[in-house]
From Swiss-Prot:
Gene transcribed to yield this protein: obg
Region (Disordered): 129-148
Protein name: GTPase Obg
Subunit architecture: Monomer.
Chief location of this protein within or outside the cell: cytoplasm
One GO location term (cellular component): cytoplasm
Span of domain Obg: 1-159
Cofactor(s) this protein requires: Mg(2+)
Amino acid sequence: MKFIDEARIEVIAGQGGAGSASMRREKFIEFGGPDGGDGGKGGSVWATADRNINTLIDYRYAKTHTAKNGEPGRGADCYGRAGDDIELRMPVGTIISDYETGEPIADLTTHGERLCLAQGGVGGWGNIHFKSSTNRAPRQKTNGKSGERRKLKLELKVLADVGLLGMPNAGKSTLITAVSNARPKIADYPFTTLHPNLGVVRVGSERSFVIADIPGLIEGAAEGAGLGHRFLRHLQRTGVLLHLVDIAPFDANVDPVADAAAIVNELRKYDEALVEKPRWLVLNKVDIIPEEGRKKVVSDFVKKFKWKGPVFEISALTGMGCDKLCYSLQDYLDSIRRDRDDAGERAQDPRYQDQPEDKNQIKYFTCALL
């Protein structure tokens, strides 16, 4: 299936049905009075997050989605039937915003999450609402209200714990194949990966995380070189980035340090927040380097690249070092989740609310709790 991560649609809710201005007419009832029912409510347009969908291709060509109108009211105080709602199923991770103003409307991050995109119009009143002591036979009625109409932009950002980035042919697809259940296309030419791939990495029976592989970046991606940098949006939700570097390129003219620096530069051009995100350096294809000279090659690269963070040496093809990398990632992600849960519990705990600003008082308060 073709991967589409952007779409523009128009949603039109149904119009409410008109009220009825009928009079009660029955045998032996001379002055029946008004009995016009109300019009039915117009159908609404809903969006629902579905984890079984991973692309917005359904909305690339079907751009207009219209709900049904409500039916008019009838005599004998019969209300009109409400228009049927329509449901638009979207991938988890879809961001919905107003196309004309750019204002964000919703971020569907949970399976089954539901949102009303366009509210159906209210049905009109029948003449039964207008009778009074001075007007026993009203002919007034009201028409139904129009439903909401909106132009929306849909943008998909995949939900993953770990994101892979690097130059084309750095071995990203090989790595995600080696450690997860994903099976992306792998070949010996640049830009084999044309769209993001997701894989689930299982570390033990009850521990796992999701890893995302995006198309490779090259220098000038911000200006549209290669496949550009539009796929970088899929890394914005990740907890940690793996910067994959081909430490032993076959082309002697290729400088791994310059390539790695170019990737960081492209990240900065796209979003400064991505540069600040936790990033680990993963040196791939170390099995090609003779073991006696491997340590020096790695240390020279780290020194020239001026890297201060975690460094992992792997071979995605043979699996060397992949287990250590996966276990380290799982431990790191677990620690992030624990910190997040602790912060949430602390925010909800009344003992930590409205604490005094004075440091001495805070220390005393904490000791009292212990």
